[in-house]
């Protein structure tokens, strides 16, 4: 099995040294991601492309590699190819006839050939020879150079012949690690997830900082969003997840700050804490999901007042983005369904929030605040490697049992997304398997027959453990985790 990976055009426009550096980083990222699924994968860097090879030809492995390549930043598109050798142009024609002849019946077609190396024929010569032969020896409706129903793409590279079976779109952007690291203030909502994704796509390693205002269930949901982003788009690099216990700060604000100023003061306290954490991590900037005018605290005046509390660069990738566009993007990247299940936890709700904060008034309110509390909660914040989320969950809920065998009255509940389940179906002989995506569990699990025991399944066992914890905390004891 072979894939030809094409680099994002902005990479190709860079100077030679920069292009070389970006290409090598992308090669390493692809290798890191793919070899965890297939140890036989070889990743070879050429001047304008990256070759991915593997001896594992299984349909499941192919689907996994396609999914991973399509989610790796820095790739414009990649080609799924079949490789062979040839002797002459007639051999190229005969191999092409064997590959695509039956599919041309009743269809118009054209042949496109890219040629690399020294040959006694040109690319146009090859296209005419192969196309003419197919036109004469199949039941096609004829050659159509513009707008054909079928385009046959071949590549002749010296003595090798490549049939391009399918072209897959890539994610675009820059390879992860080509830009400086950043810290995302993630809440679990639509906005912070999408803003984090945009920086990942642009080549930054994104660490996650969560201000816990809503207890354990809220944190679990936010971990799901962060893990989804890392697992799908950024798993070539290690990142941190930090949960800052912000309840004491909220309590202090509720007690000492005027109602109308609470929202801006809370955001300033978050920026203070995030700046401290970012400095400890050695990152270059903070990211938020704020969009201009979306809520009362997100006016230009308020954002300016909020930013003055930190000397660190604060990035807002969504500042001029409509809410519906943000939600649509969240659905594409797979975080929307999780965000929809996360309640809005806000310990500070102003009845009449200010939309034009005055620095003098805000500073007057903050004089009442014990700012040492910020450093205290930052010092208390647990920092974990996002890959260890599964282990952290295991420590939190030892009562959630993981099983690999089945007993009577047990049903395997596949909680993967529909696309993932279709790409790699779970089929266990003699066992009842039902599908309920993880983002529907909170609302629909209670509608299932509760006299059954449900074994939650996902590919890596992380989301299933997180969901098992959520269901246990919600009072459901009839859940386990299935790990084959």
Swiss-Prot record:
It catalyses: [ThiI sulfur-carrier protein]-S-sulfanyl-L-cysteine + a uridine in tRNA + 2 reduced [2Fe-2S]-[ferredoxin] + ATP + H(+) = [ThiI sulfur-carrier protein]-L-cysteine + a 4-thiouridine in tRNA + 2 oxidized [2Fe-2S]-[ferredoxin] + AMP + diphosphate; [ThiS sulfur-carrier protein]-C-terminal Gly-Gly-AMP + S-sulfanyl-L-cysteinyl-[cysteine desulfurase] + AH2 = [ThiS sulfur-carrier protein]-C-terminal-Gly-aminoethanethioate + L-cysteinyl-[cysteine desulfurase] + A + AMP + 2 H(+). It comes from Psychromonas ingrahamii (strain DSM 17664 / CCUG 51855 / 37). One of its GO terms (biological process) is thiamine biosynthetic process. Catalyzes the ATP-dependent transfer of a sulfur to tRNA to produce 4-thiouridine in position 8 of tRNAs, which functions as a near-UV photosensor. Also catalyzes the transfer of sulfur to the sulfur carrier protein ThiS, forming ThiS-thiocarboxylate. This is a step in the synthesis of thiazole, in the thiamine biosynthesis pathway. The sulfur is donated as persulfide by IscS. One of its GO terms (molecular function) is tRNA binding. The active site is at 458 (cysteine persulfide intermediate). This is tRNA sulfurtransferase. InterPro entries: Rhodanese-like_dom (IPR001763), Rhodanese-like_dom_sf (IPR036873), Rossmann-like_a/b/a_fold (IPR014729), ThiI_AANH (IPR020536), ThiI_fer (IPR054173), ThiI_N (IPR049961), THII_Thiazole_biosynth_dom (IPR026340), THUMP_dom (IPR004114). Pfam families: ThiI, ThiI_fer, THUMP. It comes from the Bacteria. Residues 406-484 form the Rhodanese domain. It is found in: Cytoplasm. It is an enzyme of class 2 (transferase). ATP binds at residues 185-186, 267, 289, 298. Signal peptide: none annotated. Its EC number is 2.8.1.4. Its main location: cytoplasm. Pathway: Cofactor biosynthesis; thiamine diphosphate biosynthesis.
